[in-house]
Amino acid sequence: MEQPAGLQVDYMFRGVEHAVRVVVSGQVLELEVEDRMTADQWRGEFDANFIEDLTHKTGNFKQFSIFCNMLESALTQSSESVTLDLLTYTDLESLRSRKLGGRPGPCPRSAQLNSKRYLILIYSVEFDRIHYPLPLPYQGKPDPVVLQGIIRSLKEELGHLRGMNGGQDARETEIWHLREQVTRLASEKRELEAQLGRSREEALAGRAARQEAESLRGLVRGLELELRQERGLGGRAAGRRSQDCRRLAKELEEVKASERNLRARLKTLNCELAMYRRGRRTLPAGAREDRALSSRERSTSRGRTATRSSSRESNRGARSHGRPAHPSPSPTGSRVPRFDPTAFVKAKEKKQREIRMKRQQQQQQQRNRMGSGGSGDGPSVSWSHQTRPPAAVTGRGDAANRSRNRSSSVDSFRSRCSSVSSCSELEDFSQSVSKSRRCRGRGKPPSPIPWSGSKTKSTTRERNNHQRHLASSGAWVPIKEYSSDYQGADMAEIDARLKALQEYMNRLDTRS
């Protein structure tokens, strides 16, 4: 290939500007490097054999012409696969040691080696980099006389060329300007490439930011949807809670009304107990109406109370149907007076005297019936809750049996009073007492056994007087006469129950 006569290019080696001149004449390559700052020069001549032997040693053989073309491409920077570098001997040895993996050798002591420079042609392939070193001995600074001669010869040549053809001068000037423009455009190209790389990076970053923003928007939309759903659920839950609050408030009002009715019932029972204690048996018509009204209110309160058991409601209903029409004072009446022991003892003695009188009258009547040949058998009595002991029915048992029966009744009553812990249980107990009385009133006394005494017959007038006396005292007037022992046991049991009930009420007053 025909090579140019010469080529001079300014090249930057490690930040220092150098002038590189290449001249190829036949099979000889002349290479000169000059430092623009210090004017130091390094020059070398290489024939084709040296170049080919150098490329063979590196492991990548190149012919002389190809090597010259590679050097020209590196100087003009027309190919990215070939570049140039200027190294000292020390730099070259360190490069060789790194390539071979050994330690760098000691620095040379020769000044000639230190002053020598090596122009390195670097050929970069896909997976390898080959270095072709060209040694350039130091030539020193140029001689001023020689430089002046060169300058004069160049001026003469320049004048001759200008005189020969002015058009060629213009062409050369244009070429020089074009070269400068090419250099400037090459630098601008490099700057634009760098700017393009930065723009691509920014575009990639912006795309990632947009994707992240889209994902955040989707997350926000999902959270807003969940928030609306939670608000809907919260509104429904609040509505249910408000309904529960209204229902509980209504139940509370019903419970308060039931409590007021129970308190009124308790006061009514206290008043009834006080009236029973005083021995009042006959009641006016107005009191009966009040009692019926109170009974209706209590039945309404029991119907609204959900905590009552069905068995207790049925028992209370049965007792309310069979309860006698006793007076019920107003719940807002005065407080029941406290228990008076002296009055209670006097009333008890009075009742005992009445019992003895009734017993004597019954014995007299039995003697009269026995004397007249009557059988003396009365109608049988059916008891729904308890069975009378034979000693209390026949009248043949002695006083010890009667007292034992009375004491057992008192003990059972006291044990029941001790188990009563609320007003509702006290209400059931008072109703059970009234029920037992009604059962006795509705039932028939047991048939008395004839008494082995005198057979004196009582008159009809005495029997009528005895019935009127029982009616005035509030007791049940039997259709047929029954045993005096049975009456005594019944009255004693009633007294014992009233006494135990009074003690229980006293304990309640003491607690309050």
Curated annotation (Swiss-Prot):
Subcellular localization, as worded in the UniProt entry: Cytoplasm, Cytoskeleton, Microtubule organizing center, Centrosome; Cytoplasm, Cytoskeleton, Microtubule organizing center, Centrosome, Centriolar satellite; Cytoplasm, Cytoskeleton, Cilium basal body
Modified residues (Phosphoserine): S328, S330, S372, S375, S447, S473
Region entry Disordered, spans: 282-415, 430-472
Record's compositionally biased regions (Low complexity): 406-415
Keyword entries, A-Z: Acetylation, Cell projection, Cilium biogenesis/degradation, Coiled coil, Cytoplasm, Cytoskeleton, Phosphoprotein
PTM-bearing positions, type Phosphothreonine: T282
MF terms (GO), sorted A to Z: identical protein binding; microtubule binding
A GO biological process held by the record: centriole assembly
Residue ranges of the region described as Head domain: 1-142
CDD domains: HD_CCDC61_N
Quaternary structure note: Forms homodimers (via head domain). Interacts with CEP170. Interacts with PCM1 and CEP131. Binds tubulin.
Function noted in UniProt: Microtubule-binding centrosomal protein required for centriole cohesion, independently of the centrosome-associated protein/CEP250 and rootletin/CROCC linker. In interphase, required for anchoring microtubule at the mother centriole subdistal appendages and for centrosome positioning. During mitosis, may be involved in spindle assembly and chromatin alignment by regulating the organization of spindle microtubules into a symmetrical structure. Plays a non-essential role in ciliogenesis.
Comment, domains: The coiled-coil domains are involved in microtubule-binding.
Name this protein carries in UniProt: Centrosomal protein CCDC61
Species name: Rattus norvegicus
